[in-house]
Every structure is written in C-alpha cells, then in structure tokens.
Amino acid sequence: MSLSTVSNHIINPLGNVVYGNPSSPTSTSSSSSLTPTSTNEEMIKKEDSGTSEPSSPSTGECNGKKAGRRKIKIEFIDDKSRRHITFSKRKAGIMKKAYELSTLTGTQVLLLVASETGHVYTFATAKLQPLITRPEGKNLIQSCLNTPDNPNSPSMANQNSNNNSNLLQQQQQQQLQQQQQLQQQQQQQQQQQQQQQQQQQQQQAAQQAVQQQQQQQAAQQQAAQQQQLQLQQQQQQQQQQQQQQQQQQQQQQLQQLQQQQLLQQQQHQQIQQHQQQQQYINSNGYPETIYDIQDKDIERRLGKDNNNNNNNNNNNINNNNNNNNSNNNSGNNNSNNNNNNNNKNNSNNNSQYIQQQNLNIDLNYSNPNVYPIGNYFQQTVQSRYIQSSSSASSSPASPNQFNYSNHSMPLNNQFPPC
C-alpha cells in the first residue's frame, strides 16, 4: 500500500467528516528500496535513541555537539502554543509509524487522532477504511468523541480547573448582571411608582377640576332654575292679575249691562206710565180756552198790560230753558226741551200736550220751578204771582190758585173742575 493512497479523514464535532490532505511522512528519498528489516532496524534505533535517557555530556568532546537528546517529561503541557507544536510533530510521527507497521508487517491498521480543536485525523488500511467512510462508522466515532472525559486525567483536571475558574467568572458576571438587573428593576419600579404617583396626582387634580366644574354647573343650573321659577311665578302672577282684571272687567261689564237693562226697564216702565198718563189726560183734559181765560182774568186783576205779561212770560221761559239745560245731561233732553220751548212761543197754538217721541228723555223731571200745563211750560204760582198775593184775596179762586204751598202739580196732572 503506497503512501499516496492513504488519506486523512477529519471529523469535526458536529459529525461531519473533513477529508484533508494525506500526511506526508518524512522518509528518506533514495533510489534503492529499503527492505523491511533494514527499515525496521533503523526505526527501532531511532525510537531507542528518542526515548532513551539522555547521556551525560562528555567533557572530552570539543566539537560542542550534544551527547544525546534531552528527555521530555511525559505530562500535560499547559502552554497552548507548545501543545499545538507538540501535537503536530507527534501526529506526523505516529502516522508514519502506522504506515510503516502496515507496510512492513502486512497487518490491518486503523489510526484515529482527534485534536483539541475538533479535527480528526485517521489512517486505515483497505479493510478497515469503511469504518471511517460509512455513516455508521462516522456516527460511532462521533458518539465516542461526545462522551465526557475521565476526570482523573490531567487534561480533564486542568479543564475542570479552567472550567471552575470560568464558572466562577461566569457566576460573578451573572451576579453582577443580576445586581445590575435588580438595580434596573428597582429603578424601573421607582420610576413606575413615581409615574403612578404623578398619574394619581393628575387624576386627583382632574377629578377635583371636574368636581369643581360640576359644582359650578350645578350652581348655575340651580340659579337658572330659580330664575326660571321666579319668571314662571311672575308670569303666573301676571296671568292671575290679568285674569282677575279680566274677571273684574267682565263683572263690571255685566253690572253695567244689568244696570243698563234695569235702566231700560225703568225707562220703559216710566214711558209706559207717562203714555198712560197722557192718554188719561187727553181723555179727561180741559180746553185751552179755560187756561187763557184764567190767565187773562189774573192779569186783569193784577192790573198789568198784556205786553208786559208777554215779555215777562218770555223771560221766564228763557230762564226756565237755561235751568233745564243745566239740569239735563243728555243731548236728547236738551233737544226735547228746545222743542217744548219753541212750542211755547206760539201763543195761539191750541193743541194738547205734545207726546214725547224720544224714549231716552229724562222722565224724572226734578225742577220745582216749572211744570208742564197745556202746550207750554208755566211758571210756579209763587214766582209768577208773587206781587199779587196780597191784592188778590177777594178775587174768586181760579183753577191755577190751588195748593200754593207745595208748588207742585196735582196727581195725574188733573185739575179740579172749574
């Protein structure tokens, strides 16, 4: 089996096999082929010389060469760089030894070297090579490499110490981190508490503001309600006053209507009575000539002229008209009195009493100075014949000379017979 056919298979810790370049053993390049015996002897000599104890240096040698190789103490190398150099040298040597062994003896050899970096170096003959190339062999190698190391081994002790130191550092770092986290949490809690307090204060301030606004609104609403109630009460009072005024006005109107109705009834009754009296007078009246004869007789007895009597009568009539105008309040009475006065100016009128056509005439005639007789207003006896009261005692009595003391008309405007 030639050296060129041998290949190194590298398996990383993840289970992937890395195929590296074959290791090239440092063999002597000579044209003559070495026999297995010669090569074996030479290798044995080299091993003996490499593993043997170093001989004491001879003082007689003057060439300055070393007497032998320095013996290396077989123990774990702490220096990582030295350990890497030693691994590379020893790995090459052992690979060469495995090749020589398989070649010289014809035995099946399987060599596997795993570095601390996770690389795996293998040497296998043809029959044992499937253990490395097949997935089953790869998985087996990977499972073996994944098993924990022996704690009694020096490398494991150093690794444990390193791991312990690392663990301590990690624990310290974790503690620091935890302390920092606690401090951060405390700060966050304090900030949260401060924020909560601020929020509570803000909420309280907002609630107080809202309560104040609500109180102000309630006060405003109460004031508005009171104003509305006052306005409503005022309106109700005004309405009640208006209703009372309307009721009073209605009552007054009713009273006025009732009074008017009563007045109308009284006037109607008085008119009916007056009409009845006029009818009775017309039926039982005296001729006008009687009154003319009586007046002329009285004037003759008094010794006055007719002209003077007429003037006096006219003056008395005018005075009576003025008195009637002052006593009467309605225009209808004035018009009727004027009509009566105009009728009196006609001395030759022989008609009877003029019937009143206006129903609104004041029938309660209260002037005691004048009263109707015939077709004109005659003055009272006392005012008309006051000068002849003493001289006419021996004259015969006339129809106009009765009841001088009362100065009023007889009942039903009736005169005693002449």
Swiss-Prot record:
Residues 400-418 have a biased composition (Polar residues). GO terms for cellular component: nucleus. Induction: Induced by the protein kinase A (PKA) which is activated during culmination. This leads to the expression of srfA in prespore cells. GO terms for molecular function: DNA-binding transcription factor activity; DNA-binding transcription factor activity, RNA polymerase II-specific; protein dimerization activity; RNA polymerase II cis-regulatory region sequence-specific DNA binding. It is found in: Nucleus. Residues 22-39, 51-61, 150-170, 306-351, 388-399 have a biased composition (Low complexity). Disruption phenotype: Cells have an abnormal spore morphology and show a greatly reduced spore viability. No defects in the overall morphology of the structures were observed during development, except for a delay of 3-4 hours in culmination. Prestalk gene expression is normal. Expression of the prespore marker cotB is unaffected whereas expression of the spore gene spiA is greatly reduced. Mutant spore show no formation of mature actin rods. The spore outer layer gets wavier as the spore ages and suffers a progressive degradation. It comes from the Eukaryota. Keywords: DNA-binding, Nucleus, Transcription, Transcription regulation. Residues 14-67, 144-170, 301-351, 388-418 are annotated as: Disordered. Transmembrane segments: none annotated. The keyword Nucleus applies. Residues 67-127 form the MADS-box domain. One of its GO terms (biological process) is sporulation resulting in formation of a cellular spore. InterPro entries: MADS-box/MEF2_TF (IPR050142), SRF-like_MADS-box (IPR033897), TF_MADSbox (IPR002100), TF_MADSbox_sf (IPR036879). The keyword Transmembrane helix does not apply. Required for proper slug migration, spore differentiation and stalk differentiation (under nonbuffered conditions). Could be involved in late events of spore maturation necessary for spore stability. This is Serum response factor homolog A. The gene is srfA.
